[in-house]
Amino acid sequence: MEVALAHPALKAFMCGSLSGTCSTLLFQPLDLVKTRLQTLQNNMHPGAPKVGMITVLFNVIRTEKLLGLWKGVSPSFMRCIPGVGIYFSTFYSLKQHYFQEGSPSAGEAVLLGAGARCVAGVAMLPFTVIKTRFESGRYNYISVAGALKSVCQNEGPKALYSGLTATLLRDAPFSGIYVMFYSQAKKALPQEISSSSIAPLVNFGCGVVAGILASLATQPADVIKTHMQVSPALYPKTSDAMRHVYVKHGLSGFFRGAVPRSLRRTLMAAMAWTVYEQLMARMGLKS
């Protein structure tokens, strides 16, 4: 009863948080493999054979057991559950305020998605930093609270916002591009499909296509963000991380970890949007 009486933006927050919980739990291993691939670059000697996604995956299972693939899931939950909720509630509020009478155009969809992601990204960045460090395997943090305390004591609170520029350069365009492709793909669907029982499956397919395109476009920013958050002392500025990656690995270094990241971001976004839209429909709200 209390849920039914809640403000629509709060309902959007709850639907988003639940969808974020499901997608984070399922796809955390891909995020861990992506982080390990990107941070492995710094330990590789020139001419050393390239390490692929499958090699990293089996190495983690061998040295850290199967559950090692979910290392960093606690900060991921602390970031994604409220973070996805904030994103969808902000998205819903902006859409209702500016586009109540009709659907946004392709350009407006980019701004809508990017704006909502900026709000969520800034709010949850400290947990993004901790999550990245957990996954890198370089830090012996026991808990999220302990990690936050350690960073504040040893590096200062400013370190919790390391990689802010790179994070926003990665997440805002990803969300904007994703929302644009996703909304345009759904618009192109025949009405009989949109209102049929297979609509969730079709929407998921639209989300997968949108996610792949958005992931590839923002991969370089993700590599830079990871370097800055794992080693903030070495790369205090975005330009420092960019220079290091380019000098040591060339242009291909900016696409290290692209496969696991694209898989994870694409599947997470597609699932989150599909679950969110179904939950919102159950509550009688248009997402």
Curated annotation (Swiss-Prot):
Solcar repeats: 7-97, 104-188, 198-282
Tissue-level expression: At 24 hours post-fertilization, expressed predominantly in posterior blood island, posterior cardinal vein and circulating blood. At 34 hours post-fertilization, becomes restricted to posterior blood island and circulating blood.
Superkingdom, natural source: Eukaryota
Record keywords: Membrane, Mitochondrion, Mitochondrion inner membrane, Repeat, Transmembrane, Transmembrane helix, Transport
Subcellular location: Mitochondrion inner membrane
The reaction(s) this protein catalyses: glycine(in) = glycine(out)
Main localization category: mitochondrion
Bilayer topology annotation: Multi-pass membrane protein
GO biological process: erythrocyte differentiation; glycine import into mitochondrion; hemoglobin biosynthetic process; hemoglobin metabolic process
Transmembrane regions listed in the UniProt entry: 13-38, 72-98, 110-135, 163-186, 202-228, 257-275
GO cellular component, one term: mitochondrion
Disruption of the gene: reported phenotype: Fishes lacking both slc25a38a and slc25a38b display anemia.
Name of one Pfam family that matches: Mito_carr
Molecular function, one GO term: glycine transmembrane transporter activity
Matching HAMAP family: SLC25A38
Family, as annotated: Belongs to the mitochondrial carrier (TC 2.A.29) family. SLC25A38 subfamily.
Task performed by this protein: Mitochondrial glycine transporter that imports glycine into the mitochondrial matrix. Plays an important role in providing glycine for the first enzymatic step in heme biosynthesis, the condensation of glycine with succinyl-CoA to produce 5-aminolevulinate (ALA) in the mitochondrial matrix. Required during erythropoiesis.
Protein name: Mitochondrial glycine transporter B
Originating species: Danio rerio (Zebrafish)
UniProt gene name: slc25a38b
